């Protein structure tokens, strides 16, 4: 495609679900940091690599008291005494490592901060709340909510996420960070549960989390990503949250 670099490594492999954060904290941290370093070293030694991208996470923002909308220059507190925070801390380290390689070795790299991405390609073992809601809905079961669900999040259908990543690769400025966010897909966890139940014709019920589930919970209240920088590159999301959830369930039912 015109405008796209020829060789495009993408640093994306990671434990990316709360259960893994709680039960495999060492693997989560090392996969992020060492895996990312290996890709960066490859970029340095292979001059045909024209650009690489790191897929980071909204979790790097930590807790920003009094802030609901997060732009790329913000940074909040992450409690290092909580094991599940090995994920956001290691993602922060990866971001700094990428920018350091850009400065010291002159590679061309960009960073994408992803929101809560969903779609039919999610792992069946994914323990994130919205992934569990989708599995419940797919099986015709009641949607189980294990908290008040009042935290508001930015969600993104996988098709929109993929197109945003390609836009950042093709048009993003070297060393810059870009939030991936679709303003049509902002909702509370409870609203996502209700939407899944409505699409599937089931009901939302409340249950207590078990010990491992509770250890994996994020402590941040609201996290709505500001997509101003990404929109300036010419990108806009196509899918509303309801449309994306409907497509996800329809696709999985046809498998």
Each model region followed by its residue ranges:
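A short acidic, helix-capping loop that chelates divalent metal ions and anchors anionic groups
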Residues: 18-22, 119-120, 213-215
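C-terminal substrate-binding subdomain of Rossmann-fold SDR/epimerase-dehydratase oxidoreductases
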Residues: 137-255
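Short, solvent-exposed loop/turn segments at secondary-structure boundaries
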Residues: 23-24, 121-125, 218-219
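Asparagine-centered polar/low-complexity signal
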Residues: 31-32, 36-38, 116, 136, ...
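N-terminal Rossmann-like NAD(P)+-binding domain of SDR-like oxidoreductases, especially those catalyzing
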Residues: 1-115, 247
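Residues that form or flank phosphate/diphosphate-binding pockets in enzymes
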Residues: 16, 47, 62, 124, ...
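NAD(P)-dependent short-chain dehydrogenase/reductase
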Residues: 64-73, 96-154, 158-169, 189, ...
